Curated annotation (Swiss-Prot):
Family indicated by similarity: Belongs to the ParB family.
GO CC terms, sorted: chromosome; cytoplasm; nucleoid
Record function comment: Effects nucleoid occlusion by binding relatively nonspecifically to DNA and preventing the assembly of the division machinery in the vicinity of the nucleoid, especially under conditions that disturb the cell cycle. It helps to coordinate cell division and chromosome segregation by preventing the formation of the Z ring through the nucleoid, which would cause chromosome breakage.
Main location: cytoplasm
A GO BP entry: chromosome segregation
Keywords of the record: Cell cycle, Cell division, Cytoplasm, DNA-binding, Septation
Protein name: Nucleoid occlusion protein
Pfam families: HTH_ParB, ParBc
Location(s), subcellular: Cytoplasm, Nucleoid
SMART domains, per the entry: ParB
UniProt superkingdom: Bacteria
One of the record's GO molecular function terms: DNA binding
Length: 290
């Protein structure tokens, strides 16, 4: 079943030109294939809109060995942006594998796409592969929202995802860079990162991040730690003070003034006031000898 890219993101007559298929999300409709060309690798640059920021060297090496054995079955897809200069639309992993093999040229199909279309294809193609980290996925959603001026709900409908899925991913982008880096490097999981969001305070978030990594805290332990920190941060409730009658105030002030007069006379008087629910207690100590 085809997931027509142009229908989802409103590229009008481009529908017949570019389609993504469930069987191979990088595959361009064969009916509109241009002739495959051999393009020098030095003339090709990665997609500037590529959401993937971390490439697994081991998996690229595996792909390179497969290509060496079986050849490059699926050409990469590029667009020309200057004379003899091309930008990858789809197939950066294949491009990297071919580069690792030392190829001078790589089979490619040239498509005529503008910046918005190129960015959208790269983002959608990677999202459908479900190999992105949580942060890369969040960045891809944010870019699609900006490119097509969509709401979270509209994007969710176009991608066939729940709005809460989109919203939860986008919240990760508000976290400090150190936490996002930890997610990219897979030092912590997405659930760890999401547990940190309620803390708000960046210093506390980074403190807990350090604890997660150093103590190898699981998600439950992390959530319990954060719950404790949130409880500690709550303002303490002040005890409700009962109204004091005028007569009581006069009595207290009279006693205090009397004690001050005694002290002024040179006698060392110690006093202590205590407040209870129903009464005040004043304890006075007067020395027998001056």
């Amino acid at each position: 079943m085809k997931n027509t890219f142009s229908r989802l993101f409103g590229f009008g007559d481009k529908e017949s030109e570019f389609e993504l298929q469930d069987e191979s999300h990088e595959e361009i409709d064969k009916k509109v294939y241009e002739e495959i060309q051999e393009i020098p690798i030095v003339n090709i640059t990665p997609n500037r809109y590529q959401p993937r920021t971390v490439f697994d060297d081991a998996r690229i090496e595996e792909l390179a060995l497969t290509i060496r054995t079986h050849g490059l079955i699926q050409p990469i897809v590029v667009r020309q942006y200057e004379d003899d200069k091309y930008e990858i639309i789809a197939g950066e992993r294949r491009f990297r594998a071919a580069t690792k093999l030392g190829w001078e040229k790589v089979p490619a199909i040239i498509k005529n796409l503008n910046d918005t279309e190129t960015a959208s294809v790269a983002l959608i193609e990677n999202l459908q592969r479900e190999e992105l980290t949580a942060i890369e996925e969040a960045v891809a959603y944010q870019k699609l929202i900006e490119l097509h001026n969509l709401t979270q709900e509209a994007l969710a409908q176009r991608l066939g995802k729940g709005q809460s899925t989109i919203a939860n991913k986008l919240r990760l982008l508000k976290l400090p860079e150190e936490i996002k880096s930890a997610l990219l490097e897979k030092s912590i999981t997405e659930r760890h990162a999401r547990a940190l969001i309620p803390l708000k305070n960046e210093e506390l978030q980074l403190k807990v991040l350090q604890e997660i990594v150093e103590k190898q805290l699981n998600v439950k332990q992390t959530e319990e730690r954060i719950t404790k920190l949130l409880e500690e941060a709550k303002p303490k409730r002040k005890a409700k003070q009962k109204a004091v009658s005028r007569d009581t105030r006069i009595a207290m002030n009279t006693i205090r003034q009397s004690l001050q007069m005694v002290a002024d006379s040179g006698l060392n008087v110690n006093s202590e006031e205590e407040e209870f629910d129903e009464y005040y207690q004043i304890t006075i100590q007067i020395p027998k000898k001056k």
